[in-house]
């Protein structure tokens, strides 16, 4: 067994994650009117990278609800947009933290090890939920796609931000999860700086697949409507470029 597989085993926390999956099913049934579209697109298993838009702190739970596997996440070390009452949930599930604004070598090694073990990796390419329209992805998802050569499964989440406002009105929000067809693998010929344009193009292709699965008015930088693209200007600014997570 490779040393990285010992350090980053897949699957892990099986009992805890099975319980959390049941909790996610129950929570969405109680709190929202949920539709999942495209379940016929689910492959038989890994290695697989699952990607989705990231507009809400509820998104990781929605990904757990949408797919049948014990998904492994890499995600932000801090959770600035999540209510303090729910920040314990990702810690119980367990994930490999990324210190945003840094290269986060350890998290990338963990992600590679998970995929080498035919695992399923969840990642939100936008690397944060500070906006409610689609933004260009950060380099991490494209880098892992090229590095591992695995297929990618796109998900599109709609109206998750409505869940708690609707509950305060005594109503259940109508939430949709769309599952797209797997795509990839990707390869890049260049090395170092010469590879950057290829990775950027792959990143845009990944986001384009996600854009097809969300409402047109939420497609932001990937909209066909110039007015929507113009309104999204500025959302691509990454808050951690100047202030990396410690």
Model-derived segments and spans:
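Non-catalytic C-terminal accessory region of glycerolipid acyltransferases
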Residues: 1-16, 106-246
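A transmembrane-helix-recognition feature enriched in membrane-embedded lipid enzymes
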Residues: 2-41, 83-93
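Short, basic, glycine/proline-bearing loop/turn elements
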Residues: 23-24, 92-98, 124-129
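Glycine-rich, highly charged phosphate/nucleotide-binding loops
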Residues: 33-35, 102-108
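Conserved beta-strand scaffold positions in the cores of enzyme catalytic domains, especially
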Residues: 36, 73, 95-97, 152-154, ...
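Flexible, charged surface loops at secondary-structure boundaries
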Residues: 42-45, 116
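Catalytic core of membrane glycerolipid acyltransferases/transacylases, capturing the structured
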Residues: 44-102, 110
